[in-house]
Regions:
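Conserved N-terminal helical subregion
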Residues: 1-62, 68-74, 78
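Well-ordered beta-strand positions
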Residues: 21, 28, 37, 43, ...
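Short beta-strand-initiation
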Residues: 31-33, 103-106, 169-171
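Beta-strand-connecting loop/turn residues
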Residues: 32-34, 115-116, 179-180
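Conserved FAD-binding catalytic core of PHBH/FMO-like flavoproteins
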Residues: 52-152
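Short coil/turn segments at secondary-structure boundaries
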Residues: 91, 155-158, 244-249
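FAD/FMN-dependent oxidoreductases across multiple families
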Residues: 127-219
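C-terminal helical "tail/cap" subdomain of flavin- and related membrane-associated enzymes
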Residues: 211-296
Length: 296
């Protein structure tokens, strides 16, 4: 699925843009020109380097940019393909929310992937917990252990592939205003996968950089830190980053906190989903290929 998205995105690159595949071995920056050395020895000379390396630290460290941990091991996610089997409801997609705060499970999504379904589970479990450690070896049993109501929708499902595990730290960067280099997306600030803000944040970064700042920067000499600082101070970018941070805190608290405030918030969200689900079923029944959203 991810590979397909990448191929589609790369197909949009115009022929006038040179596309190079390689591993960056070194990077040197200055107020005027930047030099990127590929592992094979080729050198790319450019006015600006845009760093979109996700959680990778190697190039950031070469540039003297430090990562500041906000919340280590914030989210633990699992992904795997399943075959739905002959029974149960027929749906193109399903979101099933965790049943108890003690389980630490936010929600499960099921999306079509060829002849199978792609299951993604977003949790705030400790990776050392019994359930989390054992899940990769016996995913079906342990999934039904914490989501028994899922059997109503998928009574005969089978896990048909390897379970992938993803641990996400929440972090941001310091000392990042540097000559000739811009960090975007997770390279600047990571996002909670359960909150679903990573792509939207990245798109805001790209939109503001390409439409507002790059035309101005390239129209004048130099690429010093004073220019770069304007991008990081952009109000739209800062607002998107702040929304992502708040969403990460909200999803975790909504999932695992047990005090009265969050119990009431869970009930509110449950009633809202049930109401929207009822309306959706009246407009387009689930059995008629609607999209389901369930919390027991």
């Amino acid at each position: 699925m991810y590979g397909d998205i990448v191929r589609i995105a790369r197909a949009q690159i115009p022929p006038s843009v040179k596309f190079i595949v390689g591993r960056v071995a070194d990077i040197e920056t200055s107020p005027e020109r930047q030099r990127v050395t590929i592992s094979g020895g080729d050198v790319i000379d450019a006015r600006l380097v845009v760093l979109a390396t996700g959680q990778g630290d190697v190039l950031r460290q070469k540039l003297g940019i430090r990562r500041r941990m906000v919340f280590p091991k914030h989210t633990l996610s699992f992904g795997f393909p399943i075959h739905r089997g002959p029974g149960g409801a027929r749906f193109p997609a399903l979101t099933y929310y965790g049943e108890h705060p003690r389980d630490g499970i936010d929600y499960l999504t099921l999306l079509p992937l060829g002849d199978s379904l792609r299951a993604n589970i977003f949790t705030f479990c400790d990776h050392r917990d019994r359930w989390a450690r054992a899940f990769r070896d016996d995913p079906k049993r342990l999934l039904l252990e914490v989501m028994p109501g899922l059997a109503h929708f998928l009574p005969d499902f089978e896990v048909v592939g390897k379970v992938q595990l993803f641990m996400m730290d929440l972090s941001t960067v310091e000392d990042h205003v540097r000559d000739g280099t811009v960090l975007i997306g997770d390279a600047f600030q990571t996002s909670c996968p359960a909150a679903g803000t990573g792509v939207s944040r990245l798109l805001v970064d790209v939109d503001r950089l390409c439409k507002t700042y790059l035309p101005e920067w390239l129209a004048t000499p130099g690429m010093g830190a004073d220019k770069i600082a304007r991008f990081y101070a952009d109000p739209a970018k800062r607002a998107a980053d702040a929304r992502a941070s708040r969403a990460a805190e909200f999803r975790r608290a909504l999932t695992i906190e047990t005090n009265l405030k969050w119990e009431l918030r869970r009930r509110e969200m449950y009633l809202r989903r049930r109401t929207l689900g009822w309306i959706a079923q009246r407009l387009r029944p689930l059995s008629d290929h609607g999209i389901g959203s369930v919390r027991k």
